[in-house]
């Protein structure tokens, strides 16, 4: 049996962008790799127990192109419909991958890199601890008194009882730090990791102030995605009970006319995505939007995404259109909340205030040292790019994962669509969530996942922010995000509110620098994924090479023929023209 090559350097610590090819296996493209596999298969028929060896350093396909932001209406680049490789039959398969990711050393060890001496895990752990301790000295922390209650923060009894009915009995750190200050009339910038209760931190004081002085369109809440807007809408309704709250949900994918009517009726709270609200400001007329000119509260939830100027999916132009009709900052309370406090968010601390108004209150709770909770286990699986789907299938079939609720994150809508088709053909209970789906289909798919009718959700970054699904046990990064902050939002879908969770990252050759950047951002190294009695490489070789390759062809054919998941052809609307 051929031995797996040992101690293979995955990627050099220099800035060379191209992978290093071994001299003995000079193939530079997927087609060359396919030819080499065919030659080996011919040799198998004549020589017994001959093993096929695939080089881990072969080029990645177009699936690893630059990531694109998931805004409401952005288009994504289609995946490369490359020529399918022939499935490898029964011969065994050797994956040449190093057992550990080579990480950068701690400060003071630069000389050791030049000598080729790796840094031990213990040294890396010490470096991470020292960085975390240094960062902790500079943060503004909310009170941590365990005896703090909502009553002591000034919350009225009816709201305290409403929260108790929702099993919310004690305020979290971000709620302790913000609710009292918002009730005093201060603008607020709140930063706290995912799952820490940021929605309640701004919903409670808004509802209390509204009950004291009700008026039309008392507050506008802007957020990054339709699903998050719907969730905030539902949470406002739940917290405001037993009182009847007149709220309007203004998001893309829904009927503009009914939304315009709802705005014209002066709801108490407007929850919206910036793009759709900007559409109404441009086209629905003054009678519809005049209520926005007297708003008392403006909330930017996921403020880092809303204020980001990166890429073609930036929402800043829509935000500017919305701000143009709202009262000036000195005449309203402005609240910004996010899990990742960016320089753009912090810059708003200098917003002008009217004379006598207190300065902006900034509360950051565990946004640097504890960007992810301690209850989240991070791990990685190193694999060959051409067999990513095979590893995913076998990972989902392991004993520990057969009953767990799992979200699989990808970078592009085309990948999400492909995996939805493929995993359904492989008999997994799966659904998907991405920007190419109709809005009602997005709501239905998310509902199926929440209700456990589907245990796997394949999603782009539209599902990475704010969604609270307590049952999610595992987050799989099928494609690693290009921005470490996006990683924090993705893995924040699990291990919420003190629960345990797991984040598993699929790492190809070119992903190692991304892993190192993520580890630096979250302050903790990832561990190699392990499960007792499970060897994914062996399972892929033994069970999945032929099966998954066949189903992959079928999935691609279904997509090409415009079939729905499950094989039915999509209905085409016929347009009848006059002859």
UniProtKB/Swiss-Prot annotation:
Q: Which GO terms describe its molecular function?
A: ATP binding; ATP hydrolysis activity; RNA binding; RNA helicase activity
Q: Does the keyword ATP-binding apply?
A: yes
Q: Which reaction does it catalyse?
A: ATP + H2O = ADP + phosphate + H(+)
- The segments labelled Disordered in the record are 1-117
Q: What is the protein named?
A: ATP-dependent RNA helicase DBP8
Pfam families per UniProt: DEAD, Helicase_C
Q: Which organism is it from?
A: Pyricularia oryzae (strain 70-15 / ATCC MYA-4617 / FGSC 8958)
| All copies of domain Helicase C-terminal, residue ranges | 391-537
| EC number in record | 3.6.4.13
């Amino acid at each position: 049996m051929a031995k797996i090559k040992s101690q293979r350097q995955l990627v050099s610590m220099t800035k060379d962008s191209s992978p290093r090819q071994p001299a003995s296996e000079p193939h530079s493209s997927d087609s060359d790799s396919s030819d080499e596999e065919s030659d080996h298969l011919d040799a198998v028929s004549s020589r017994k127990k001959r093993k096929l060896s695939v080089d881990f350093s072969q080029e990645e396909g177009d699936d690893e192109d630059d990531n694109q932001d998931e805004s409401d209406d952005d288009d994504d680049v289609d995946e490369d419909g490359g020529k399918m490789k022939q499935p490898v039959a029964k011969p065994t398969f050797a994956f040449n991958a190093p057992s550990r990711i080579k990480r950068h050393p701690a400060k003071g060890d630069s000389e050791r890199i030049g000598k080729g001496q790796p840094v031990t895990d213990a040294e890396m752990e010490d470096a991470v601890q020292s960085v975390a301790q240094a960062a902790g000295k500079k943060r503004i922390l909310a009170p941590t008194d365990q005896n703090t209650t909502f009553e002591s923060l000034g919350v009225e009894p009816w709201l305290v009882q409403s929260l108790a009915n929702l099993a919310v009995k004690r305020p979290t750190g971000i709620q302790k730090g913000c609710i009292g200050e918002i009730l005093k009339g201060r603008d607020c910038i709140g930063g706290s990791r995912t799952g820490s209760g940021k929605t309640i931190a701004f919903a409670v004081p808004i509802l209390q102030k509204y009950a004291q002085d009700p008026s039309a369109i008392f507050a506008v809440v802007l957020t990054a995605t339709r699903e998050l807007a719907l969730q905030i809408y539902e949470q406002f309704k739940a917290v405001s009970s037993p009182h009847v709250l007149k709220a309007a949900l203004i998001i893309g994918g829904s009927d503009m006319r009914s939304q315009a009517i709802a705005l014209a009726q002066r709801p108490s709270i407007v929850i919206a995505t910036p793009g759709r609200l900007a559409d109404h400001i441009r086209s629905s007329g003054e009678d519809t939007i005049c209520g926005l000119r007297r708003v008392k509260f403006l909330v930017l939830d996921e403020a880092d995404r809303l204020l980001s100027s990166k890429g073609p999916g930036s929402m800043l132009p829509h935000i500017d259109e919305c701000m143009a009709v709202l009262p000036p900052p000195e005449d309203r309370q402005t609240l910004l909340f996010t899990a990742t406090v960016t320089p753009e968010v912090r810059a708003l601390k200098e917003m002008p205030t009217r004379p006598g108004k207190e300065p902006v209150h900034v509360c950051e709770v565990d946004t640097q040292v504890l960007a992810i909770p301690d209850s989240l286990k991070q791990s990685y699986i190193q694999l060959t790019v051409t067999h990513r789907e095979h590893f995913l299938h076998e990972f989902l079939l392991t004993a520990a994962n057969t009953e767990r609720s799992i979200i699989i994150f990808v970078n592009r809508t085309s990948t999400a669509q492909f995996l939805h088709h493929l995993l359904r053909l492989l008999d997994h209970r799966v659904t998907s969530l991405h920007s190419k789906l109709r809005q009602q289909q997005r709501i239905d798919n998310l509902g199926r996942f929440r209700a456990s009718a589907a245990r796997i959700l394949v999603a782009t970054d539209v599902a990475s922010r704010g969604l609270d699904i307590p049952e999610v046990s595992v987050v799989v990064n099928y494609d690693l995000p290009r921005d470490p902050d996006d990683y924090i939002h993705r893995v924040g879908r699990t291990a919420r509110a003190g629960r345990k969770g797991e984040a598993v990252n699929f790492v190809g050759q070119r992903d190692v620098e991304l892993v190192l950047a993520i580890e630096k951002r979250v302050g903790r190294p990832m561990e190699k994924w392990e499960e007792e009695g499970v060897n994914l490489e062996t399972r892929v070789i033994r069970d999945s090479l032929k099966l998954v390759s066949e189903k992959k062809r079928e999935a691609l054919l279904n997509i090409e023929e415009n079939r729905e998941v499950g094989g039915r052809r999509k209905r085409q609307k016929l347009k009848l023209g006059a002859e």
